[in-house]
C-alpha cells in the first residue's frame, strides 16, 4: 500500500487489500480515492535519498518501533526477550577469513548493524559507528566425541542467544563460528531486534552468500550500494508523523483498542505471577502435507493468507478457553 500511496498520492486503507485482493479491485479502490480527492496524509511518500540525510554529527532520531524497544530495555535492563538468534549449518570447506570479510562488508553496507543508541538530553539517539574490520571468534569442537560435540554446540548456541546486549555500546550483531568437523561448521548469529527483524535476517543470509563468494575470489562486492539506510526512514517517519498527522493515527488506534482487556485470563493450573518472569516454553509441532494443503486452500477461498487463517484459529481457541470474544494477539 505504500507503493500505491507513492505512485498515486492517495491513501488507500490496508483493509481494502483484504476486501478486494485482486489487482482490478485494488485499481477500483485507487480510482475511488482519486475521485474523492483523498490525498495521502503528507502527499506522496518521498524517497529518502542519501542527500537528504542529516550530517553524521547530527543526532539521528529513533523510529517509533526502535524507541519502544529502547524504552523496554531501559525499563528492564539485561533482558534477552528481543534477542534474535539464528544458527546456520555450513557444509563444505570454509575460509574463515573470507567469511569475516563478508561480514565486514555487510556491516559497512547496513549502517543499522553498526549503530548504537545513546542518550542526549534525556532522549535516545542513533549513533552510527565507523565501518571497520570484522572479527569472527571461533571455537573448534572437532576434537570432541560426536555426542559431546553436539551437546557442546547446543550449549554454546543457547548461551550465545541468552547473552544480553548493551544498546549503548554494541555491537548489536554477534557472530561465532563453531568448527564441528572437517567440512562441517555452525555459524551462531544473534541480533538485537532494535536493528533487525526476521525479514532482515533473510536478507543478511542471502547477501552473505554473495559476498563470501566474492571474497573467496578476491573480487569486490557485487552488490549495489544501498540508496537509503534505516536511519533515513527513521528521520522521515519522525518528520511525517507529527502534529495533526500523528494525532489522527493515534486517535484511530485508541478507538480501535478502546476497552480491550489488559490480559487474557486462561484456566491455568497455577496463578499468574505478580511480575512476569518470561520463563516460558515452546511447543513445536508439524502439519502434514494434507493439513498444509487444506490450510492453503481455505486461505485462497477466503482471499487471505495462511498466517491469517492460523491466527484466526488461535484466537478462536483462546476465545473458547477464556470465554471472551474481544481478544488481542501479539505476533513478531
List the predicted regions and their residue ranges.
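Glycine-rich loop motifs involved in handling phospho/adenylate chemistry
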Residues: 11-24, 57-62, 91, 192, ...
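Aromatic/hydrophobic pocket-lining residues that form π-stacking "cages" and hydrophobic walls in ligand
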Residues: 295
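Hydrophobic "lid/gating" helix adjacent to the active-site nucleophile
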Residues: 103-119, 265-267, 298-332
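Phosphopantetheine-dependent thiolation modules in NRPS/PKS and related acyl-activating systems
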Residues: 1-48, 123-127, 131, 206, ...
Amino acid at each position: 500500500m505504500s507503493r500505491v500511496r507513492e505512485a498515486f498520492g492517495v491513501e488507500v486503507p490496508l483493509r481494502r487489500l483484504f476486501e478486494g485482493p485482486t489487482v482490478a479491485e485494488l485499481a477500483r479502490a485507487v480510482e475511488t480515492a482519486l475521485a474523492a480527492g483523498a490525498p495521502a496524509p503528507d502527499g506522496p511518500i518521498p524517497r529518502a535519498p542519501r542527500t537528504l540525510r542529516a550530517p553524521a554529527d547530527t543526532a539521528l532520531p529513533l523510529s517509533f518501533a526502535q524507541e519502544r524497544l529502547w524504552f523496554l530495555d531501559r525499563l528492564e535492563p539485561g533482558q534477552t526477550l528481543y534477542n534474535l538468534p539464528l544458527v546456520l549449518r555450513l557444509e563444505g570447506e570454509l575460509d574463515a577469513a573470507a567469511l569475516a570479510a563478508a561480514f565486514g562488508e555487510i556491516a559497512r553496507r547496513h549502517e543499522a548493524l553498526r549503530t548504537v543508541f545513546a542518550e542526549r538530553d534525556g532522549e535516545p539517539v542513533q549513533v552510527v559507528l565507523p565501518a571497520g574490520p570484522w572479527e569472527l571468534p571461533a571455537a573448534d569442537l572437532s576434537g570432541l566425541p560426536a555426542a559431546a560435540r553436539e551437546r557442546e554446540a547446543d550449549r554454546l548456541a543457547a548461551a550465545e542467544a541468552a547473552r544480553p546486549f548493551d544498546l549503548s555500546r554494541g555491537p548489536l550483531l554477534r557472530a561465532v563460528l563453531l568448527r564441528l568437523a572437517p567440512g562441517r561448521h555452525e555459524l551462531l548469529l544473534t541480533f538485537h531486534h532494535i536493528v533487525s527483524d526476521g525479514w532482515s535476517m533473510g536478507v543478511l543470509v542471502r547477501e552473505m552468500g554473495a559476498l563470501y563468494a566474492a571474497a573467496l575470489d578476491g573480487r569486490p562486492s557485487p552488490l549495489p550500494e544501498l540508496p537509503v539506510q534505516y536511519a533515513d526512514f527513521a528521520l522521515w517517519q519522525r518528520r511525517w508523523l507529527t502534529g495533526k498527522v500523528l494525532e489522527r493515527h493515534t486517535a484511530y488506534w485508541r478507538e480501535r483498542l478502546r476497552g480491550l482487556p489488559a490480559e487474557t485470563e486462561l484456566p491455568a493450573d497455577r496463578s499468574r505471577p505478580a511480575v512476569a518472569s518470561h520463563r516460558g516454553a515452546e511447543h513445536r509441532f508439524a502439519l502434514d502435507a494434507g493439513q498444509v494443503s487444506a490450510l492453503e486452500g481455505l486461505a485462497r477461498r477466503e482471499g487471505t493468507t495462511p498466517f491469517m487463517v492460523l491466527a484466526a484459529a488461535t484466537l478462536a481457541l483462546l476465545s473458547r478457553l477464556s470465554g471472551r470474544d474481544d481478544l488481542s494477539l501479539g505476533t513478531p
